[in-house]
Design a protein with these regions (language model features):
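Hydrophobic beta-strand-centered segment that forms part of the acyl-chain substrate-binding groove
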Residues: 1-3, 69-106, 132-134, 139-140
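Conserved positions in beta-strands of structured domains
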Residues: 23-26, 91, 96, 108-112, ...
């Protein structure tokens, strides 16, 4: 059973289709979180990456890790509706094997260091227990800008 379902994730993260890359949060502790992304053949990125051999772009695997980490960071912020978690950097990124349509991507982030508004996490992505990608993700907590007025 999931700790957070997709509707609850959408209440925490500002991302929406097609850029929301987390379907569920499976486990969550103070300094560790595990999320899941079902990678389907209908993902929009498979249209061009690559039509003959669809592979999930590595940058989107990293983004999915960062989103899972963002849930962990925002869950600890009292006034999270007024904050955003921005992806700041990735270090030591390694991609071990392709992620294909039909794969279930398990994304784990562990907090390594936290200073006021900056969080450093170890991210690991697995499929069927095999590491497909890993890296050190850095995120920054910032104030959410006020909604802009419609132009017209």
């Amino acid at each position: 059973m999931a700790v957070l379902e997709n509707i609850e994730i959408r209440d925490i993260l500002p991302h929406r289709y097609p850029m929301l890359l987390v379907d569920r949060i499976l486990e969550m502790e103070e300094d560790r979180i595990v999320g899941m992304k079902n990678v389907t053949a209908n993902e929009p990125f498979f249209t061009g990456h690559f039509p003959e051999y669809p592979v999930m772009p590595g940058v989107l695997i990293v983004e999915a890790m960062a989103q899972v980490g963002g849930v962990l960071v925002l869950k600890t912020v009292p006034d999270r509706k007024s904050k955003l978690v921005l992806f700041a950097s990735i270090e030591e990124a390694k991609f071990r094997r392709p992620v294909l349509p039909g794969d279930t991507l398990i994304l784990e982030c562990k907090t390594l260091k936290r200073k006021e508004t900056v969080v450093k996490m170890q991210g690991t992505a697995t499929v069927n227990g095999q590491v497909v990608a890993e890296g050190i993700v850095m995120c920054k907590l910032v104030d959410r800008p006020a909604p802009s007025e419609p132009q017209g």
